[in-house]
Amino acid sequence: GTGKTITSLNCLLEIYKRNGYYKAIILVPTITLVNQWEQECHKFNFMNVIKVYSKNPLWKEDVESIHFNEEYRLKNERETSYVIISTYASYTREKVFNTLNGFSKKQLLLIADECHNMASGSMLKRLAYIPYLRRIGLSATPDRQYDDEGNRNLRKFFGAENHYTYEYSMEEAIRKGVLCKYLYYPHIVRLTTEELEAYVELSERIAKYFNDDTCSVAKMDEGLKMLLLARKRIVHKAA
């Protein structure tokens, strides 16, 4: 990779150097990534890590303990430091969402790994209610195909409309030796007659959602999503 994880944790480290504490919520799409991020946090010596996912039934007690310490901290006591790592699936649940959004909106850093996941479904509906002002979104593929509305909301949430987004292209990464050079070897796979007919029929139905003036889809609804997935399956199953 190009170092997205390390870059974001260095931002958290900088907050620690300036203020003497670290406070972060890290959102990830899978349980595997929860564990990977925990390992990376430990490398930065962020040791107070709480994992919020189905395999950790004690997470709520740990989070409530942090809430208690922050609420009743004496002026001469040090700030509580912590990193909370949650899957998107857990975070969007009502009780979890309310519990994890009760921290200081000015102190806590929100890191969203594979942040394009935030632009759809229940996560998209939650964006407006996430209070934290420090936000970092990480993604190698931030723009969602055929989802202009989701892309707009995501850019607005992370301040990309105000040019606060840093882009590091694959071309630049290869040129600087961060990524290895590689060669493409296309393997042509042709659709059967039945597959092609189904593909064309789905494409015609999808085209009805397309705005010729803007060359885009105004809004991604469930009907369009199902059509796109059905067409995608035809390509993926082609032999």
Give residue ranges: language-model regions.
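SF2 helicase/translocase NTPase motor core
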Residues: G1-L133, E149, K208-I234
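Interdomain linker/hinge connecting the two RecA-like lobes of the SF2 helicase core
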Residues: C11, T165-A239
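Hydrophobic/aromatic beta-strand patches that form the interior of the parallel beta-sheet core
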Residues: I25, I50, I111, I136, ...
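A short, hydrophobic secondary-structure junction motif
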Residues: W37, H116-N117, H163-E167, A239
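Short, acidic Gly/Pro/Ser/Thr-rich loop/turn segments
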Residues: K51, D143-Q145, E194
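Short amphipathic alpha-helical patches
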Residues: E64-S65, S139, G150-N151, E197, ...
